[in-house]
């Protein structure tokens, strides 16, 4: 059985990854793949928080047993059978840095090794870029979403102000057409 998983950052539209993962894949194997693909630090404790469709916590899985088992004992199949629909994957527990992993469904007829999840779709840079100030176009406020070559409403307002500036310059000319010199400028 192969599952489709969507990895997202909460509140950010400009980032996602879609993986095709064998049901026999352990959470530890998934962790190693995510850490590699998304360039997460290797020296941090990790945790998978399993949630049901209502958002209730079903279990927590880490490198050490947190009461529900360790990441190398729990396969994706077992988690889905237990009712898990979403994981919050903390790749840096200390600093509470996480991504959301949603189980989108089964992929019939697809064969994938349990040892290597397949990255099927990708959008946006890695999460570290968002921490460094990167803002995806989709996440910009509507008034800042202007493509090159398009005019925004603000550009039209600026043109009106430029016309007023020209009128003021014309008023500064003397009656005989000579410009008046002002020392304060």
Show where each model-derived region lies.
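Short linear regulatory motifs enriched in tryptophan with gly/pro/ser
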Residues: 1-185
């Amino acid at each position: 059985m192969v599952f489709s998983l969507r990895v997202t950052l909460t509140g950010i539209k400009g980032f996602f990854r879609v993986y095709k993962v064998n049901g026999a894949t352990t959470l530890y194997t998934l962790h190693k793949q995510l850490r590699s693909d998304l360039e997460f630090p290797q020296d941090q404790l990790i945790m998978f928080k399993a949630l049901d469709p209502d958002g209730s916590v079903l279990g927590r899985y880490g490198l050490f047993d947190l009461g529900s088992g360790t990441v190398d004992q729990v396969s994706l199949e077992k988690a889905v059978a237990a009712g898990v629909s979403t994981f919050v994957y903390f790749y840096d527990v200390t600093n509470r840095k996480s991504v959301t992993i949603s189980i989108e469904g089964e992929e019939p007829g697809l064969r994938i090794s349990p040892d290597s999840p397949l990255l099927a779709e990708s959008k946006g840079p890695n999460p570290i870029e968002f921490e460094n100030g990167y803002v995806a176009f989709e996440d910009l406020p509507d008034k800042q979403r202007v493509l090159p070559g398009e005019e925004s409403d603000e550009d039209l307002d600026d043109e009106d102000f430029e016309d007023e500036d020209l009128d003021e310059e014309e008023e500064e000319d003397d009656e005989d057409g000579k410009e008046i010199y002002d020392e304060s400028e």
